[in-house]
Curated annotation (Swiss-Prot):
Residues 48-58 have a biased composition (Basic residues). It is found in: Host nucleus, Host nucleolus; Host cytoplasm; Secreted. GO terms for cellular component: extracellular region; host cell cytoplasm; host cell nucleolus. Belongs to the lentiviruses Tat family. It comes from Simian immunodeficiency virus (isolate EK505) (SIV-cpz). Keywords: Acetylation, Activator, AIDS, Apoptosis, Host cytoplasm, Host nucleus, Host-virus interaction, Inhibition of host innate immune response by virus, Inhibition of host interferon signaling pathway by virus, Interferon antiviral system evasion, Isopeptide bond, Metal-binding, Methylation, Modulation of host chromatin by virus, Modulation of host PP1 activity by virus, Phosphoprotein, RNA-binding, Secreted, Transcription, Transcription regulation, Ubl conjugation, Viral immunoevasion, Zinc. The record marks 11 as: Essential for Tat translocation through the endosomal membrane. The modification Asymmetric dimethylarginine is found at residue 52. This is Protein Tat. GO terms for biological process: DNA-templated transcription; positive regulation of transcription elongation by RNA polymerase II; positive regulation of viral transcription; symbiont-mediated perturbation of host chromatin organization; symbiont-mediated suppression of host innate immune response; symbiont-mediated suppression of host translation initiation; symbiont-mediated suppression of host type I interferon-mediated signaling pathway. Residues 1-48 are annotated as: Transactivation. HIV-1 lineages are divided in three main groups, M (for Major), O (for Outlier), and N (for New, or Non-M, Non-O). The vast majority of strains found worldwide belong to the group M. Group O seems to be endemic to and largely confined to Cameroon and neighboring countries in West Central Africa, where these viruses represent a small minority of HIV-1 strains. The group N is represented by a limited number of isolates from Cameroonian persons. The group M is further subdivided in 9 clades or subtypes (A to D, F to H, J and K). Residues 73-82 have a biased composition (Polar residues). Asymmetrical arginine methylation by host PRMT6 seems to diminish the transactivation capacity of Tat and affects the interaction with host CCNT1.
Length: 93
């Protein structure tokens, strides 16, 4: 084992940093690449801000998940009494 220079910071000691850069691969070799990769990829620990979970929204295409109501004439929607009386007269005769 080589003697370490006491004036050198611990993160600059020889062998403290890997020779290759970290990547996004999650294979077994890359998970054990360095301590950071092990905690991030191997253990799945992230110390960043947590994203707020969003509510599930209805898709834009299906807003109500229901069939649209058939269009009715204005007189039937408002309950026009004259139209109903005429219909009753035709039914009676």
């Amino acid at each position: 084992m080589e003697p370490v220079d006491p004036e050198l910071e611990p993160w600059n000691h020889p062998g403290s940093q890997p020779k290759t850069a970290c990547n996004n691969c999650h294979c077994k070799v890359c998970c054990y690449h360095c301590v950071y990769c092990f905690t991030k990829k191997g253990l799945g620990i992230s110390y960043g801000r947590k994203k707020r979970s969003q509510r599930r929204r209805t898709p834009q295409s299906n807003k109500s998940h229901q069939d649209p109501l058939p269009k009715q004439p204005l007189s039937q929607r408002l309950g026009d009494q004259t139209g109903q009386k005429e219909q009753k007269k035709t039914l009676e005769s």
